[in-house]
Swiss-Prot record:
It comes from Methanocaldococcus jannaschii (strain ATCC 43067 / DSM 2661 / JAL-1 / JCM 10045 / NBRC 100440) (Methanococcus jannaschii). The active site is at D89. This is Probable tRNA pseudouridine synthase D 2. Residues 160-371 form the TRUD domain. Disulfide bonds: none annotated. The gene is truD2. InterPro entries: PsdUridine_synth_cat_dom_sf (IPR020103), PsdUridine_synth_TruD (IPR001656), PsdUridine_synth_TruD_CS (IPR020119), PsdUridine_synth_TruD_insert (IPR011760), TruD_catalytic (IPR042214).
Length: 422
């Protein structure tokens, strides 16, 4: 691991297979949906209106988009007519708000894992209407000897954590390779190969088998096309890309068949990684070596701080750092850090314009620190699901866009985590 002093602490984090390796202690997350409760926070004054009925949607172990699709189908409503502020975790018990035009009448739903409750009127909800989220998270499987260390961590939790984009943002990244970066560098074949051959364990067997076949027979598009027909593959992405490659063997042209939603995901993943790297570099200027802790994740390492000087905290708590976008003029500290990170990536600012078919890098600013509000820390109790172990529940609010899992990592620095297997 280069550029990490031996004085700095290092932990290995693997969110993708839902386990985290640290000092030899254990904890368990999401053993049941009620262990991870998420509640949307919205300003009802800002969404005031009379065009739609406003509903509270409570779901358990269901993805938001699947819940929306179910509601649309059940009540014969076009999916586009369901307004929402954000998407919520699947493996959780979540509450969020949706709006549906009044012309569809007053709706109600009360099923074991899905409940729709009419609570009033509003305008049509959009993603920007979300203020934040309230989390109530129960951590289980704790050993008695680890409790003093955890208590020490919790004392400093009010100072928050770096506001990193967490692993959930990087589902399209494999072996630390970004599709967007490969496109920028003109490696179109590699970009297509990542897309057509790499897969997550959670993908359907039909698609995993297809990707393994494509990988094994890479370049033999006639043979791959026959496999697609024989196995009745319906996905337009694979059908159209392989058909184009069979016809022209043009990898750049094949990428044009990727839908816009996926293209945005690829660009956002790389831009988010670059932002993480910039913030990590910035924090090195403020955090002494002995207070640094590193976690390994899909894209490299994330640097946390064990504690932070109050004077430094006051400097950073409201400070923002911009995303990297080629059409923006940066200056001072920001320019210095961005140039250093791009140099490490083997890129220039101008080359980011080569993103081409995938879209563009969008400029925005994001707070450097994620600071939990209304933080409540429960007592250590006997864990009824893990004999001889302990549990604790944390409750806190975060601004929209911040990841609850980052705060959990900060709270349990030095504790080995094992999440529920999917």
């Amino acid at each position: 691991m280069k550029n990490i002093s031996t004085k700095e602490s290092f932990f290995k984090f693997k969110f993708n297979n839902r386990s985290l390796y640290c000092w030899g202690a254990f904890m368990k997350l999401r053993m049941k949906p009620e262990d991870f409760i998420v509640e949307e926070i919205i300003d009802f004054n800002k969404i005031a209106g009379d065009r739609c009925y406003l509903y509270k949607l409570t779901k358990r172990n269901i993805e938001s988009l699947k819940a929306f699709s179910y509601i649309a189908k059940k009540f014969k409503i076009p999916l586009k007519d369901i307004g929402y502020c954000g998407l919520k975790d699947r493996h959780a018990l979540t509450t969020q708000y949706i709006s549906i035009p009044k012309k569809y009448g007053k709706l109600s739903l009360d099923e074991p894992n899905l409940k729709l409750e009419l609570i009033g009127e509003s305008k049509f909800l959009l993603l920007g209407d979300l203020e934040g989220n309230r989390f109530t998270i129960t951590v289980r499987g704790l050993k008695k000897e680890d409790i003093p260390k955890i208590k020490e961590n919790l004392k400093y939790l009010e100072f928050g954590a770096p506001n990193y984009f967490d692993s959930q943002r990087f589902g399209s990244v494999f072996d630390k390779k970004f599709i967007a970066k490969e496109v920028i560098k003109g490696n179109y074949e590699e970009a297509v190969k990542i897309l057509l051959t790499k897969y997550k364990k959670s993908e359907k067997k039909l698609i995993k088998d297809l990707k393994r076949f494509i990988d094994k027979n890479w370049g033999d598009w006639d043979k791959i096309w026959e496999y697609i027909k024989e196995n009745n593959i319906k996905s337009r992405l694979y059908v159209n890309m392989v058909k184009e490659l069979k016809k022209s063997n043009d990898y750049k042209k094949a990428l044009s068949y990727v839908d816009d939603r996926l293209k945005k995901i690829f660009v956002a993943a790389y831009q988010s990684y670059l932002w993480n790297e910039c913030v990590k570099e910035l924090l090195r200027k403020y955090v002494p070596e002995e207070d640094r802790v590193y976690y390994e994740y899909e894209c490299g390492t994330l640097m946390f701080y064990k504690k932070m000087d109050e004077e430094v905290f006051n400097i950073l708590k409201d400070k923002k750092f911009p995303t990297i976008a080629p059409d923006i003029e940066y200056s001072g500290e920001e320019k210095e850090i961005i140039e250093e990170i791009l140099k490490r990536e083997g890129l220039t600012m101008e080359e980011l314009n080569n993103i081409g078919e995938l879209g563009k890098f969008i400029y925005s600013e994001r707070k450097i620190l994620s600071i939990p509000k209304n933080l409540k820390i429960g007592e250590f109790e006997e864990d009824e699901l893990n004999k001889g172990k302990y549990k604790i529940t944390l409750s806190y609010e975060l601004e929209k866009g911040s990841y609850a899992t980052i705060i959990i990592k900060r709270a349990f620095l030095g504790v080995k985590t094992k999440k529920r297997k999917r």
